[in-house]
């Protein structure tokens, strides 16, 4: 059976996009057929029907309404699909002009992928949506990444060994690599981080073609003005641009010139450390419970994106950190100005994403209004920052908001206060802005009154008070008088204006050139008004895009001001302090607190967070605190809080402490917590060892290392040996600043042998057989871990706790007697010695001793009487 012309067209288009679902536009619906329909119906939970036959089989079909397509697109993208959007390129009427059986022209206008989204409904407003390309050329490798929704474009050289931590830092939505060996090598990493991986042909990564592509995009003859790039960097950037040309069908987004980064500009933080410290995502994968969720007080999407970027990439440039802290000082010290700025920023829309949609021709009147409203707020923000003593960072940000008076005046005059979403709906141009549009609207909305006004005009002109303007389907609009006025109307000078149309038994009908023109205008007024508005939309959009570079700078200015004021508001509310950051190797924190735990305790209405000091300030070599103490005492919290304080300080924020002196940190490593990796065949202990190996092989003398209970996942002596050797390696080889928490109390002896190791412990107090956690860190070593008491608190059966106590007593006794815990024989520990727990005896009356105690009133006794009472108690107790 031959296929229909429509289905033949569908199959032809689908053949070009075999790896994507094809949204095939048919009127008000996007239809899907064959396997696409089956997959989409299941993913979207919509009805699967059929339409016609192909090769004797029913053709599966499903569809989604055009007006609701974005929601369905979001679902499909999140489930890992790519979608090719095929639109109608002409109307059915236009198709018929080419022949009665002609099929409406259709083609794919866009390939929707996770890394190429621009619509607000498909994006997280407060997060970047990065498309990343990785390229390897001979002995060079590089990453390039772009967010087409904001125009951000970055590149950096990166060795393959550093690919994992960089992907963890960027958290891209999509990764593109050359098909072949690089794709195969990168696939496990993409699967681990759940990043959609897209292979491209090697031609997309050709550095020579890439250079030409980039020069054409930025309208330059050479890339030297943007930086000195190696061939791998050029290749990666070119691949990003080529992929955008493929997915956007030639409509390139408004990318900013590439910003070159390098590994030595930011603190190196590997993937496991980011996960363990919960910088931007908690261990559960959500935002809640992360450091970002606690510190984020930004009020604009751009400010929120900048905060996440800074938190993910703490700086190693002292000048940059100092500039950020200086700006923060200014706003912290001026709370009134801070509140004023935050109030203005709350009304500031997202310029970046509005600008990007306009550039890709996916914008609408609300994007024009977003630019207008932002520029209007920008004028007030700039005035609020007029101060000759303003720090450079704030002064530059304020300056970026200047010089938009002409554009703002244009948009103010042209747009209504709250425009509709789509340009095709019309009604967004303000009255009085365009005379032709006003006339069209008047004719469209007030046609009757226009005709009535014209009728009055003609009645006065002819002197015929009974003159009427009427309408019928044959003549359209016409002027009608009684036949008694026929001679007058058909004689000069009236006949020069009034043109005879028809004579009936009692009436004579005329028209005028003016009436004919008005009739045409009335009939076409609606369409004309819409066309004029579309034309004006394009003109206004063009005016905005002409200022795109300056608007991008303004967007960065808004984001910077928002971030500074948000951090200032946070510092005031949470009593944070300005850290001292320098190039020393100091690490001294007074009264440090864990920002996430502190806030959680407050929300739960629990105890106040116990602040603690930390001093890892080496004179020369390593500085390591060996931290011992019971479970649940707060060791892991203490470790993490100091790492977070370092991150906050080097991103340019105040910190949760009474005082902090942070010598520049180059790397941050954290081995905290326990988890297995079953998908890769790794046990908990193996994961721990892999992460520890990475630390020992990479940490330098400016690293901050956080290690928690190394060696716990294996036999006691094996674990102790590994922890011992690890501590020595950190001290002698890495020479890092480190916090090392352990339950191996034997390690505390190393403090007497290694000059850079100091013992510290988390205090506890025992009361009537129970352990009370004080959460105070002090110098010294713990003598025990209180594991049995913690087990009791956790709710282990009383018989198990009792049995554990008896075994522990036996082991400790053997150790004291010199035999060592390992010498205890199983026979020395009778089976089931503590099980089951004895039943409580029936309640009895008070003993003689208790009766005597009840009769004693200590405050009434003289010293001699007290002594005599003690002797009496002793006699009674003997019976």
Curated annotation (Swiss-Prot):
Similarity section: Belongs to the DNA mismatch repair MutS family.
Gene Ontology BP term (one): mismatch repair
GO molecular function, one term: damaged DNA binding
Keywords associated with the record: ATP-binding, DNA damage, DNA repair, DNA-binding, Nucleotide-binding
SUPFAM superfamilies from the UniProt entry: DNA repair protein MutS, domain I (SSF55271), DNA repair protein MutS, domain II (SSF53150), DNA repair protein MutS, domain III (SSF48334), P-loop containing nucleoside triphosphate hydrolases (SSF52540)
Record function comment: This protein is involved in the repair of mismatches in DNA. It is possible that it carries out the mismatch recognition step. This protein has a weak ATPase activity.
Pfam family, one: MutS_III
Name of the featured protein: DNA mismatch repair protein MutS
Organism per entry: Ruegeria sp. (strain TM1040) (Silicibacter sp.)
Entries under NCBIfam families matching the protein: mutS1 (TIGR01070), PRK05399.1 (NF003810)
Cellular component terms (Gene Ontology): cytosol
Residues noted as binding ATP in the record, renumbered to the chain: 629-636
